[in-house]
């Protein structure tokens, strides 16, 4: 029974961000099919940030009408909306509309907004629901949340999305002949025709399965989350679960009591490890300057990971080829949840260490941004070393800053519930600032340049 409950909690947590994570890892294929092309990531970044209206409304309801809004019907509603949006996306992802003199993926962008609305709102509804369960299920929930990024990334790796080959194209007036690898000899052409011109173009290879099947898989995963939540609702929680919680974790009970000096001995001492008291004391004694540093780092890190760098990933990776872009998008999505597991085994609460790790991750992000600014001819373009460096840079960027985000959340969680509330506000503020900063740079000022990989000539 306990194993089944852990499984349900894991599947429930997996549904929190599986749809949006799935969209990001599918981008290497989508940018080749949709009219927005290289601009698509910046559009998605802004759309996802606009979807924060959902958690904002839920938070305002809890603030001004406490007790009026129950998480259970909200969770049922958003999971039903998410499943329906994924199903519609499977059939409408490539439907375009003519707007302001050009084709645009209106259906895709609108459905992405609803998926983002679901996933953003899950941040302020899933965790309050988990507070009804015994504390030891919370770790299982976060493992499931990590799988929401890992599973779509693995599926995208199998799919092989966005892979291309270069073909030779010969052109004469009124005639265009294509060959895949060997050029057409001039002896096959009529002597009366002018000399042909040659160049290379990209031809995208068909993935192992289509976006239709990929989005149907996302629909299945979201539907599994809905079923898991329904079954969790039918579990006999209540008083028995509360008693279990108290028996399994007296430290949790101690941590929510007032942190008076006389409180730090009796209840927590028998059950906590020798270092636990010092950890709680250090968390409780955080100075305002330290808290300001933590919130600033939270906002800065999320601005980079959720707003700034995703907007230019195509420009930093595609000049090295579609394989580099495909691996960067998928492996960074794998690295992020794996890095989220590290604090379970290798926790480090030192603000100095987390600051150094933030600088290191920012360095990798700066390299990615520099390559995007130099597009379509970045450093080592056309050399295998450049491909390896850009993939490693994106993976390490995601891993370093994901670890920082988790550890700062752990520090604030141990301080108070209101600290976590302000942490969430810093996350959304940083993400919003990053998205609003990059959208005009990419789509209005057009500071980043795109080009066909096969026709690039960066020798000059």
From Swiss-Prot:
Residues 28-37, 93-105, 159-211, 313-326, 372-387, 440-460 are extracellular. Its main location: membrane. GO terms for molecular function: riboflavin transmembrane transporter activity. It comes from the Eukaryota. It catalyses: riboflavin(in) = riboflavin(out). The keyword Membrane applies. The chain crosses the membrane at residues 7-27, 38-58, 72-92, 106-126, 138-158, 212-232, 292-312, 327-347, 351-371, 388-408, 419-439. The modification Phosphoserine is found at residues 242, 266. Within the small intestine, it is particularly expressed in the jujenum and the ileum. Almost negligible expression in the stomach, duodenum, and large intestine. It is a multi-pass membrane protein. Pfam families: SLC52_ribofla_tr. Glycans are attached at residues 94, 168. Keywords: Cell membrane, Disulfide bond, Glycoprotein, Membrane, Phosphoprotein, Transmembrane, Transmembrane helix, Transport. Disulfide bonds join 377-454. GO terms for biological process: cellular response to heat; flavin adenine dinucleotide biosynthetic process; riboflavin metabolic process; riboflavin transport; sensory perception of sound. GO terms for cellular component: plasma membrane. It is found in: Cell membrane. Residues 1-6, 59-71, 127-137, 233-291, 348-350, 409-418 are cytoplasmic. Plasma membrane transporter mediating the uptake by cells of the water soluble vitamin B2/riboflavin that plays a key role in biochemical oxidation-reduction reactions of the carbohydrate, lipid, and amino acid metabolism. Belongs to the riboflavin transporter family. This is Solute carrier family 52, riboflavin transporter, member 3. It comes from Mus musculus.
